């Protein structure tokens, strides 16, 4: 008797289009060339490469250029084909690429930092080159004259840099976990505010100028969405990685956030839902459910002749509870907890199946990601890994 085979439900996942291999060291940054089947990469092996797809279907370098120092970061402007490369020795080197992407012409060098350049950003509208370095300096230069316009000393080494052209606000995330917002003028800057939300260093920043929302990724494995435009101080946590978050990209047309981590995970978050802030954890000397004393509350332990318990916290209500009153686990996707977390028994009963419906999808890139670039027009994602490989993905099955 033949058994009926039930068709498997189709799982929507990114489609691997191409592996681009050949770098001797880690590719620190790379971008997809718009309107071309090409990739520009800068690597720790000191090379700048422009990879174009050949008739064979493989990507081969049309440009292979050796720099005097390892390449730490880059910024590419498609309109002018201007490529700004940050180097380990503190220099930013600028090139113009030819229309056919077969030649790069040196333009100028900026002696921007005393040590490794960590981030570089070319702003076409203002003709500015913004950068951060391991010397804890943020600097901006005029790309026309090459002159340094100003600088600001950050509290720690910066690892995230974003700029809003309309307001001239610059966002700097650093290794201490702090995010700093500066207002830039032509030759001076004003500190507007700084804030912290991560328990680890900030590893990535992403700015959405339409919703006026800043996303920060951290070595504490979390992503935080900061509502800058709302002016209410709202911060939404997203917990979906098992290792440090290395890169962020936002798809404005679908309101989806792509976060990638050292765990190889590509997480696509639906940001078109009404998310909730996680509550502050409350302090108490005894369980706020059963009133059992916690182990440091000697007086109540002595008076009630009870052994002190360890304190836990419910992730939904924030109350201090004992292990017995928080024995259950649940995901709370609208609070950013896509994995199961500790909740008190009463909150567990109150959470509905609708509230447990996931708001993110999880995918495995099969390499530890150090950098990503998203091409929204084609729906392609580039990931660069510690395995020295660049991968190109078609994200349209999951970003739509």
Swiss-Prot record:
SMART domains noted in UniProt: FYVE, WD40
Entry's Gene Ontology molecular function annotations: zinc ion binding
GO cellular component: cytoplasm; early endosome; vesicle
Main location: other
SUPFAM superfamilies for the chain: WD40 repeat-like
Binding positions for Zn(2+) 1 per the UniProt entry: 287, 290, 322, 325
Zinc finger annotations (FYVE-type) as residue ranges: 281-352
UniProt keyword annotations, A-Z: Cytoplasm, Endosome, Metal-binding, Repeat, WD repeat, Zinc, Zinc-finger
CDD domains per UniProt: FYVE_WDFY1_like (cd15718)
Keyword Ion transport set for record: no
Pfam families noted in UniProt: FYVE, WD40
Entry annotated with the keyword Cell wall biogenesis/degradation: no
TM helices/strands, residue ranges: none
Gene3D superfamilies recorded: YVTN repeat-like/Quinoprotein amine dehydrogenase, Zinc/RING finger domain, C3HC4 (zinc finger)
Tissue distribution: Highly expressed in the brain (at protein level).
Repeat region (WD), residues: 22-61, 66-105, 112-150, 153-192, 197-236, 240-279, 364-399
Binding site for Zn(2+) 2: 314, 317, 344, 347
Induction annotation: Transiently up-regulated during adipogenesis (at protein level).
Subcellular location: Endosome; Early endosome; Cytoplasm
Subunit structure as annotated in this protein's UniProt entry: Homodimer. Interacts (via WD repeats 1-3) with AKT1, AKT2, PRKCZ and PRKCI. Interacts with VAMP2. Forms a complex with VAMP2 and PRKCZ. Interacts with FOXO1. Forms a complex with AKT1 and FOXO1.
Domain notes: The FYVE-type zinc finger is essential for its vesicular localization.
Biological function: Acts in an adapter protein-like fashion to mediate the interaction between the kinase PRKCZ and its substrate VAMP2 and increases the PRKCZ-dependent phosphorylation of VAMP2. Positively regulates adipocyte differentiation, by facilitating the phosphorylation and thus inactivation of the anti-adipogenetic transcription factor FOXO1 by the kinase AKT1. Plays a role in endosomal control of AKT2 signaling; required for insulin-stimulated AKT2 phosphorylation and glucose uptake and insulin-stimulated phosphorylation of AKT2 substrates. Participates in transferrin receptor endocytosis.
Name of the featured protein: WD repeat and FYVE domain-containing protein 2
Name of the coding gene: Wdfy2
